[in-house]
């Protein structure tokens, strides 16, 4: 087969849907087949919203979507959104599967403030695609931003997409923020769930972009306030990232909101920013390293600053 035809075939290859709404797809990126899933709502219309969901460390598309009240596809169906679920590169070590995303921090291991981990940090297996990894490196070294860009382009070619929202949990949140910084021409908003980037490496887009960032006080895995995590890694405090974004985009107004039921939440919303974007920080006073709970309510909490 002609090589150009083969590459085109691999780029557009799509498996039969697992059910009436989910499709498994493959794209050739960096000479590797990368997998993503597409959720198609019941009523396809014009000017659709595409939501790209990014799983956390060791996760996959299914662990992001979840089931029951936490089922992300239910949220997409209600709002008539198309969903895309890319999967990070994975490998096996010590009998366990590891998957991760390259947010241009966890793969590097060292930033402007020095090493991103303590001397006695927990050890994570080095991804095989990393050559001579730094001692603090733990995430894939692949071009995940380019991969997600291809996933976005794929859906724009298939559907009438008006806006793109990228949402990620933990390591997926780190990548969501990195995508917001690198792909501002293709993304309209990001939602970072407990994905504080490495200390000194929290990026800011060159163009205004709407962001929602969520952290939980009892989260010791990727803490939103304390710099040092339980595993010995250093993370940029959430308030620093929020301040840098709202200052960069000249947000002139803000409002605060306290929620006590069903969860204790402190929310600060910055608006009247350049380009009409908004910046929202959500601090959960009781949660740990998890989505805001109860889950169905929590998904709406995260999207409300963008959709309302």
Residue locations for each model-derived region?
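C-terminal catalytic histidine-bearing segment of alpha/beta-hydrolase fold enzymes
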Residues: 210-214, 236, 244-308
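Primarily recognizes the serine-hydrolase "nucleophile elbow" in alpha/beta-hydrolase
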Residues: 153-209
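Sec-dependent signal peptide recognition
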Residues: 1-8
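Conserved strand-to-loop "acid loop" that flanks and positions the catalytic carboxylate
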Residues: 213-219, 225-226, 231, 283-287
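Serine-hydrolase catalytic machinery in alpha/beta-hydrolase-like enzymes
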Residues: 29-40, 48-165, 178, 182
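The conserved beta1-alpha1 loop
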Residues: 52-56, 194, 215-216, 285
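Active-site nucleophile loop of the alpha/beta-hydrolase fold
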Residues: 88, 191-199, 216-220
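C-terminal motif of bacterial Sec signal peptides marking the signal peptidase cleavage site
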Residues: 13-14
